Amino acid sequence: IVLHDHFELAEKYRLAGVHLNGRNPHYRPLSNDYIPTLSRSCHSIEELTDGQRYDYLFLSPIFDSISKKGYRSAFSPEQLTKAGKEGVINERVIALGGITPEKKTAIKDWNFGGIAVLGFLWQEPTIAGVIRQLTRLRND
């Protein structure tokens, strides 16, 4: 479990980690004997350059959002290609926003370490549909 708020609970219950975002941009451990994974949401390539202190980062929106209508891609393919070649996008950066199986090749070409999927799965009305879509993501 990774918490986006109430970070003191992560330490109290020895949870996996904390996730920083605009609401909660800082984390300071209460003790030295608990080191959680540390992640962050980024919405610009520039934000990734501070990424060395994080275990992983989410960059979004890579493509137009499926679940947030009108939330458009923030990056051109050229920007993502350049950031991937420069190592700014690397194995610790997770692509988020508008992810579908058809876009996995581009995501790999841009050097992302993985994908996070929301709307693509949320649009499925049944558990069987979600499992089918997850299988497509894994196999395609």
Predicted features along the sequence, with ranges:
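Charged helix-capping and loop-helix junction motifs
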Residues: R72-T81
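Glycine-rich phosphate-binding active-site loops on the catalytic face of alpha/beta enzymes
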Residues: L20-L30, F58-Y71, P101-L137
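Short charge-dense sequence patches
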Residues: I1, D33-P36
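Glycine-rich, small/polar surface segments that engage phosphate groups of diverse ligands
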Residues: D5-P29, T37
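Internal catalytic-core helix/loop-beta-alpha segment
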Residues: T37-G70
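Catalytic cores of alpha/beta
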Residues: I1-A16, C42-D55, G84-I89, V93-A95, ...
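Short, conserved loop/helix-junction motifs that constitute active-site signature segments
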Residues: S31-Y34, E86-V88
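Expand to "…catalyze enediolate/carbanion chemistry for C-C bond making/breaking, isomerization
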Residues: D140
